[in-house]
């Protein structure tokens, strides 16, 4: 008795299950800095200050006495005397 011929090949197998997901990617680089903001508005004006205190009272001082005046010029010559003869 001889063995018969081999049978036909079987059907292909079913698709396998999907593999596990990959690892998460690296974090991205930070973005560039934004442009500079606009200049702010000027501040409001301050209030006017209070008036200052009054100044100290001045001192009254008497001046020194004046210097002695210079000597006056000599007087005019006297009148001539009466003659004793009458």
From Swiss-Prot:
The triple-helical tail is stabilized by disulfide bonds at each end. InterPro entries: Collagen (IPR008160), Collagen_superfamily (IPR050149). Residues 16-25 have a biased composition (Gly residues). One of its GO terms (cellular component) is extracellular region. Residues 1-12 have a biased composition (Pro residues). It holds the Pfam family Collagen. One of its GO terms (biological process) is cell adhesion. Its main location: secreted. Residues 35-50, 57-71 have a biased composition (Low complexity). The modification Hydroxyproline is found at residues 6, 9, 12, 18, 24, 27, 30, 42, 51, 54, 65, 74, 77, 80. Residues 1-86 are annotated as: Disordered. It is found in: Secreted, Extracellular space, Extracellular matrix. The keyword Acyltransferase does not apply. The keyword Repressor does not apply. Keywords: Cell adhesion, Collagen, Disulfide bond, Extracellular matrix, Hydroxylation, Repeat, Secreted. Trimer of identical chains each containing 190 kDa of non-triple-helical sequences. Type XII collagen interacts with type I collagen-containing fibrils, the COL1 domain could be associated with the surface of the fibrils, and the COL2 and NC3 domains may be localized in the perifibrillar matrix. Belongs to the fibril-associated collagens with interrupted helices (FACIT) family. This is Collagen alpha-1(XII) chain. The lineage of its organism: Eukaryota, Metazoa, Chordata, Craniata, Vertebrata. The gene is COL12A1.
